[in-house]
Every structure is written in C-alpha cells, then in structure tokens.
Amino acid sequence: MSSPDQNPSDAAGQTGSSNEEVVDVRRGMFGVKGSGDTSGYGRLVREIVLPGSSPRPYGFYFDEIADRLAEALNRDGVEFEDAIEKVVVYRNELTLHVRREALLRVAQSLRDEPELRFELCLGVNGVHYPHETGRELHAVYPLQSITHNRRLRLEVSAPDSDPHIPSLYAVYPTNDWHERETYDFFGIIFDGHPSLTRIEMPDDWQGHPQRKDYPLGGIPVEYKGAQIPPPDERRGYN
C-alpha cells in the first residue's frame, strides 16, 4: 500500500478556501432563548461560517483526485462542473460538494476508477443548517482509499421542502444502517434505500431529534430517589 505525504501542510493551497459563507449569527452558548442566564454566556455573539470554494492548486494529492475524477466523469458524458458544485480544502482535508442528482455517478467513479479506488465509505453524517435557505439539510460521506491510503469527503445538500438525496446503498452497501439513522434523526429521505425506516427512535415518533428546530423537551426521570425534570424545565444557562 502506498503512503501519502506525511506533511500536507507544506503543500500549496492547503490553507483553505478563498471565500467564506456566513450562514447564521448565533447568540448565547447553546442557542436557547427565553430562559434565565446565570452564566454570562448569553451575551456571546458569533458568526457561523462555512468555508467557500478553494482555488487551484489544492495541494497534497487533492489535485490528482480532482483530475482523475473529471476524466472519469467526462468518459460518461458528464462535465466536472455539472457534477461538483465546489471543491473545498480546509484544514488539510478535501471535500467535494456534489449536486445530488450526480451523487451516484460520482461515488461509483470514485470507487471503481483504478487511480482513485475509494473502496470504503465510513458512513453518512447528517447536518442541519436552518438558516442556509434552500440547502438546509446536508449529508456528508467520508470515503477512504485502502489501495492508495487517501481520504476525502462528499457533501450533498437538499432543501427542507424537498429532503431527498439518492441512497448510496447500491454503491456502498454498508451504508444501510447509517442512512437509516440519518433519516431517523434528520429526516433526510434516501431515495432507493431498500428499507428506509427508523432505527433508534420508536416507529411512531414525531419529528427528527437532531434537527436544530426540534423542540427541547422530555419527560421527568427518577434517578437515585430524586425526580429530575425534563431539560426544558431545568435551570437556564443562557
């Protein structure tokens, strides 16, 4: 197995993106409103920033991945820019933001091309950016090439009003339960999944608990003889 350079920080373009996107302004420590602030953290104000598109050269082995993927897509009659919204290099890590209609084609090329060979998908992570209008829901796929000892991420977005993303089950079958969990907690519908049902919450549960618009609540719990109130009734810290 080949080994990549051990010091990617020396590569050109590794420092990150040329533009940054402000998607929200967060106030307070935890974003909870309407409760008493006993800590002083309620006065914190900070911008929530996402890295923008990175310029060439990306550095490290990232340019080679982009070039080989572009060649593979071109052979199938797909332009790189039509499949990839942007390429982001941030903190020495490569993320390809993929248009959802091109996700299956991109994933299959990354898996099957001999010079790419990303044989392993490490799952899928859901993210909810409620203030990123039209792109509120994100699915993030970490990929690894065992052959070439390389890593990258695929990131796909969908609007709240149409939370559909193609399932990668056909390309990476081990994503089965990962996509079910992301559906369960974020409400992303993975089209083509063989059995997209809840995996942790009860079947009749209302809502998706890891979304940022999910209400803070709960039920009282008895612990060592004491009655612990649900989170929304406890002492406030913002």
Swiss-Prot record:
Its EC number(s): 7.1.1.-
Q: Membrane topology for this entry?
A: Peripheral membrane protein
Pfam families found in the cross-reference section? Complex1_30kDa
InterPro entries from the UniProt entry: NADH_DH_suC, NADH_quin_OxRdtase_su_C/D-like, NADH_UbQ_OxRdtase_30kDa_su
Q: Name one GO molecular function term.
A: NADH dehydrogenase (ubiquinone) activity
Spans traversing the lipid bilayer: none
Q: Where is this region: Disordered?
A: 1-20
Magnesium found in the keyword field: no
Cellular localisation: Cell membrane
Q: Which UniProt keywords apply?
A: Cell membrane, Membrane, NAD, Quinone, Translocase, Transport
Q: Does the UniProt entry include the keyword ATP-binding?
A: no
User: What cellular-component terms does GO give this entry?
Assistant: plasma membrane
Catalysis performed (reactions) = a quinone + NADH + 5 H(+)(in) = a quinol + NAD(+) + 4 H(+)(out)
Which positions are tagged coiled coil?
none
Its assembly, as annotated, is:
NDH-1 is composed of 14 different subunits. Subunits NuoB, C, D, E, F, and G constitute the peripheral sector of the complex.
Family per record: Belongs to the complex I 30 kDa subunit family.
Function summary: NDH-1 shuttles electrons from NADH, via FMN and iron-sulfur (Fe-S) centers, to quinones in the respiratory chain. The immediate electron acceptor for the enzyme in this species is believed to be a menaquinone. Couples the redox reaction to proton translocation (for every two electrons transferred, four hydrogen ions are translocated across the cytoplasmic membrane), and thus conserves the redox energy in a proton gradient.
Q: What is this protein called?
A: NADH-quinone oxidoreductase subunit C
Q: Which organism is it from?
A: Mycobacterium ulcerans (strain Agy99)
Q: Which gene encodes it?
A: nuoC
